[in-house]
């Protein structure tokens, strides 16, 4: 799965953003589990998932800050 551009992430609604964050966190959990049981073959997915999660959390944080300052 290709990493989405930040402009695509900012277009998501708040609910879609929360769902995507939950989805990426579950994926990271599954990747950690596979690594612990030595079943992981795609180790590059860790980096991609962490970067994508960071992007999503950044957008969510920006929205929360803009809502509280308004």
UniProtKB/Swiss-Prot annotation:
Signal sequence coordinates: none
A GO biological-process term: translation
The UniProt record lists the keyword Acetylation: no
GO MF term list: structural constituent of ribosome
Family: Belongs to the universal ribosomal protein uL29 family.
Stored InterPro entries: Ribosomal_protein_uL29, Ribosomal_uL29, Ribosomal_uL29_sf
Alphabetized CDD domains for the sequence: Ribosomal_L29_HIP
Assigned GO CC terms: cytosolic large ribosomal subunit
Entry protein name: Large ribosomal subunit protein uL29
Pfam family, one: Ribosomal_L29
SUPFAM superfamilies cross-referenced by the UniProt entry: Ribosomal protein L29 (L29p) (SSF46561)
UniProtKB keywords: Ribonucleoprotein, Ribosomal protein
């Amino acid at each position: 799965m290709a990493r989405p551009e930040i402009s695509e992430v900012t277009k998501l609604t708040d609910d879609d953003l929360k769902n995507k964050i939950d989805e990426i966190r579950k994926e990271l959990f599954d990747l950690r589990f596979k690594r612990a049981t030595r079943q992981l073959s795609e180790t590059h997915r860790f980096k991609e998932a962490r970067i994508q999660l960071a992007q999503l959390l950044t957008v969510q944080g920006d929205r929360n800050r803009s809502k509280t300052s308004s």
